[in-house]
């Protein structure tokens, strides 16, 4: 199984139990090209312990040190983050590419749906391009 490169590693931080939030600095900066964004994710090991990223998206204008805002939903135990791989990079694709990809998926779904049930397809075909784009933008957040 390939090892996913991490952008940072926890240095002994502990997330106390009971809906607590901690900021973990990663000691690096990210410069995204225009129209791109950074997506910081945790591995499933942390998710199984009830840890989640509260703010994991960086925009191209943000130029300061990256930190992860982690939240421990686990009410029964503290989570030791030492050595945990943090800040895994997401796919570096432009926002425009993501929107176009979603629009293509909607168009394909619409064509498939029209073949299966022509009566209900009228509802989908009434969506304007603006509504489709708004739906896609919402699904990216």
Swiss-Prot record:
It comes from the Eukaryota. One of its GO terms (biological process) is dUTP catabolic process. InterPro entries: dUTPase-like_sf (IPR036157). One of its GO terms (molecular function) is magnesium ion binding. Belongs to the dUTPase family. This is Putative inactive deoxyuridine 5'-triphosphate nucleotidohydrolase-like protein FLJ16323. It comes from Homo sapiens.
């Amino acid at each position: 199984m390939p090892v996913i490169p991490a952008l940072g590693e926890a240095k002994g931080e502990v997330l106390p139990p009971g809906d607590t939030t901690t900021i973990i600095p990663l000691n690096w900066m990210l410069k995204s090209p225009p129209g791109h964004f950074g997506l910081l994710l945790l591995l499933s090991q942390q998710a199984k312990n009830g840890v989640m990223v509260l703010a994991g998206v960086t925009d191209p204008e943000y130029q300061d040190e990256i930190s992860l805002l982690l939240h421990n939903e686990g009410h029964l135990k503290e989570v030791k983050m030492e050595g945990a791989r943090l800040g895994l990079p997401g796919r570096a694709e432009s926002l425009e590419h993501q929107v176009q990809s979603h629009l293509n998926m909607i168009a394909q779904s619409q064509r498939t749906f029209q073949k299966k049930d022509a009566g209900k397809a009228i509802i989908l075909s009434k969506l304007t391009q603006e509504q489709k784009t708004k739906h896609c933008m919402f699904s990216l957040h």
